[in-house]
């Protein structure tokens, strides 16, 4: 029997002050010290910590350094996509292979198994960065890679989250932030153009043209992805509306239809029972004020994401019998189990029998 190697996983920014640590077996021969309390940590924090630890474990398992590419590069930068349990993606010269990573058990939480994928596609440029000792491709190259090769839902969400962070988006200083975002978008599209009209080009171009820095989290970005895939009208995010002395910032606004579409997440409602009740009263008042001002308000919550086709039908009925803009028709593709299955994210309830995913 060989003794396991132990790696120390650098904590994500939100856990820098966490004094407690937990030892977890990540893969054969390698354990990691996770910067969290196995008893009191939320399951999603455990999944995030294990995802980071797996990246470092993969690097430690190779004699020669690998280049972490695509989503793995972006996650090291704190940019989260739709999948909460993504594969680790690397590039190594003349290597194309996929291997498995076992499930991990932290307290009462089990993080499902995933994989290590050795990409056949080399980085778009020779630019390399180093993040906490790991070699990565340029972050812009990583996002272009995702737009070309990942599923539309995943790459769109990653793109929105990347623009949000890279532009340092603030709803109170939107002009400056959106100017920075457009400069970044121009560079992203230029890198895509240098890659040539390769397979996936049209979809990647549509994604990079429509991602928006105004999405505060992956759930809002996923909602915007659906809306943009079916709506030909101008769609805006984080729009300020003043009603009766109240100031509201709208997740998604379609002015031509006088329509507001918003995501209701747990974080918006508070944590304690008192905060929850207060938040509910404020949401009721908010909705009433917006409707009295002539806006139609549509709300979407986590359970709606359990059935993408049904949610898309619901939104299509609200938007009316219209066709999406030509480029935006490339945005839609029903997510597969590899992107959206129960091994990849949390569900609001046990997935129903027959819940639809694309086979490929």
Report each predicted region and the residues it spans.
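Surface segments flanking catalytic/ligand-binding clefts of nucleic-acid enzymes
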Residues: 1-13, 17, 178-360
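Short gly/ser-rich loop at a beta-strand->alpha-helix junction or flexible surface loop bordering the NTP-binding
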Residues: 1-197, 320-360
């Amino acid at each position: 029997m060989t003794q396991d190697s132990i790696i120390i996983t650098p904590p994500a920014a939100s856990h820098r002050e966490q004094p407690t640590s937990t030892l977890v077996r990540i893969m054969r021969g390698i354990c990691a010290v996770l910067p969290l309390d196995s008893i009191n940590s939320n399951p999603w924090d455990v999944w995030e910590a294990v995802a980071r630890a797996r990246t470092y474990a993969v690097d430690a398992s190779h004699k020669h350094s690998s280049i972490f590419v695509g989503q793995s590069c972006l996650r090291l930068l704190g940019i989260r996509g739709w999948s909460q349990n993504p594969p680790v993606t690397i590039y190594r010269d003349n290597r194309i292979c996929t291997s498995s990573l076992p499930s991990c058990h932290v307290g009462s939480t089990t993080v499902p198994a995933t994989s290590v994928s050795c990409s056949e596609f080399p980085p778009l440029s020779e630019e390399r960065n180093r993040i906490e000792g790991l070699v990565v491709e340029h972050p812009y190259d990583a996002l272009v890679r995702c737009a070309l090769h990942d599923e539309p839902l995943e790459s769109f969400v990653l793109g929105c989250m990347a623009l949000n962070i890279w532009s340092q988006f603030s709803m109170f200083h939107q002009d400056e932030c959106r100017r920075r975002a457009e400069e970044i978008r121009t560079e992203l599209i230029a890198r895509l153009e240098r890659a040539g009209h390769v397979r996936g080009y049209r979809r990647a171009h549509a994604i990079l043209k429509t991602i928006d820095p105004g999405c505060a989290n992956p759930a809002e970005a996923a909602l915007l992805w659906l809306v943009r895939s079916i709506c030909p009208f101008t769609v805006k995010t984080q729009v300020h509306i003043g009603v009766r002395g109240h100031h509201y910032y709208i997740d998604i606004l379609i002015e031509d239809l006088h329509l507001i579409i918003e995501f209701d997440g747990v974080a918006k409602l508070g944590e304690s029972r008192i905060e929850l009740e207060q938040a509910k009263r404020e949401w009721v008042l908010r909705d009433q004020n917006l409707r009295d001002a002539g806006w139609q308000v549509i709300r979407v919550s986590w359970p709606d994401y359990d059935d993408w086709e049904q949610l898309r039908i619901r939104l299509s009925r609200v938007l009316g019998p219209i066709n999406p803009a030509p480029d935006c028709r490339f945005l839609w593709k029903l997510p597969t189990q590899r992107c959206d299955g129960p091994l990849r994210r949390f569900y609001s309830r046990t997935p129903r029998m027959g819940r639809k995913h694309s086979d490929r």
